[in-house]
């Protein structure tokens, strides 16, 4: 095992927060969320600690998105092992999954219908917080600030249930979309992670189903 970088207590706290957020919601926290959780006066304080973690090779920061934080799997795994901590993190080489890649989904037909499957990919199962059932090719930039870009492959666990704040694949009428779920009483909203896109409000009686839960992301460049 390679030596782990030495982290300050605050850096370790932030790393644990990032891992917990990814395991719980499928996405890393924003700088503002880190600041609020840890009592910082501003998001800039969180940014300084994130930059320090990046310099130590623990995370990678992706510019242009508020949730652009990627864990460096091997380094983080070594840190956790040294502390006896357990998080569901990438552990390369332990397992492989063959997943169908779903392209465009025709209105009214199941997502995993054969005609929607463009091809299959074999990927590390340990890349994901929970076992996915398929990959969905992302189209558009409505989830940019969650680090989900046009052309990325979203790992999806098929389920009809999701908690507030989780990123879901939803069928609304004839359309399939990736958004963050927000329920307020009986009201349902599908939130983009890009201010250029509107909030989608599900009207009473409008056909709506949760098709799956985002459990990971693969950059399309990783598979080229």
UniProtKB/Swiss-Prot annotation:
Catalyzed chemical reaction(s): Hydrolysis of Ala-|-Gly bond in repressor LexA
The ranges the UniProt entry gives for DNA binding are: 31-51
The transmembrane segments are none
**What's an example Gene Ontology biological process for this entry?**
SOS response
| Family matches, as InterPro entries | LexA, LexA-like, LexA/Signal_pep-like_sf, LexA_DNA-bd_dom, LexA_repressor, Peptidase_S24_LexA, Peptidase_S24_S26A/B/C, WH-like_DNA-bd_sf
Highest rank taxon of the organism: Bacteria
GO MF terms on file?
DNA binding; serine-type endopeptidase activity
Pfam families listed in its UniProt record: LexA_DNA_bind, Peptidase_S24
The active site lies at: 142 (for autocatalytic cleavage activity), 179 (for autocatalytic cleavage activity)
Site (Cleavage): which residue positions?
Answer: 107-108
Q: What UniProt keywords are attached to this protein's entry?
A: Autocatalytic cleavage, DNA damage, DNA repair, DNA replication, DNA-binding, Hydrolase, Repressor, SOS response, Transcription, Transcription regulation
Q: What are its E.C. numbers? A: 3.4.21.88
Q: What class of enzyme is it?
A: hydrolase
Function in brief = Represses a number of genes involved in the response to DNA damage (SOS response), including recA and lexA. In the presence of single-stranded DNA, RecA interacts with LexA causing an autocatalytic cleavage which disrupts the DNA-binding part of LexA, leading to derepression of the SOS regulon and eventually DNA repair.
Q: How is the subunit organization of this protein annotated in UniProt?
A: Homodimer.
Family membership: Belongs to the peptidase S24 family.
NCBIfam families given in the database record: lexA (TIGR00498)
Q: What is this protein called?
A: LexA repressor
In its UniProt entry, the species of origin is given as Acidovorax ebreus (strain TPSY) (Diaphorobacter sp. (strain TPSY))
């Amino acid at each position: 095992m390679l030596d782990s970088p030495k982290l300050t207590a605050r850096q370790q706290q932030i790393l644990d927060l990032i891992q917990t957020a990814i395991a719980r919601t499928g996405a890393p926290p924003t700088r503002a969320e880190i600041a609020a959780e840890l009592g910082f006066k501003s998001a800039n304080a969180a940014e300084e600690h994130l930059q320090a973690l990046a310099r130590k090779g623990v995370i990678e920061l992706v510019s242009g998105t508020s949730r652009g934080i990627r864990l460096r799997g091997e380094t983080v795994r070594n840190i956790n092992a040294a502390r006896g901590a357990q998080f569901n993190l990438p552990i390369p080489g332990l397992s492989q999954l063959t997943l169908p890649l779903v392209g465009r989904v025709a209105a009214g037909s199941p997502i995993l219908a054969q005609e929607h499957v463009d091809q299959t990919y074999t990927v590390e199962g340990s890349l994901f917080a929970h076992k996915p059932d398929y990959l969905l090719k992302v189209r558009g930039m409505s989830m940019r600030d969650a680090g989900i870009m046009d052309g990325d492959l979203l790992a999806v666990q098929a389920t009809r249930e999701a908690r507030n704040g989780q990123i879901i694949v939803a069928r609304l009428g004839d359309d399939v979309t990736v958004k963050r779920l927000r329920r307020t009483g009986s009201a349902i909203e599908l939130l983009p992670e890009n201010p250029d896109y509107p909030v989608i409000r599900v009207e009473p009686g409008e056909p709506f189903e949760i098709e799956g839960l985002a459990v990971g992301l693969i950059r399309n460049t990783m598979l080229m």
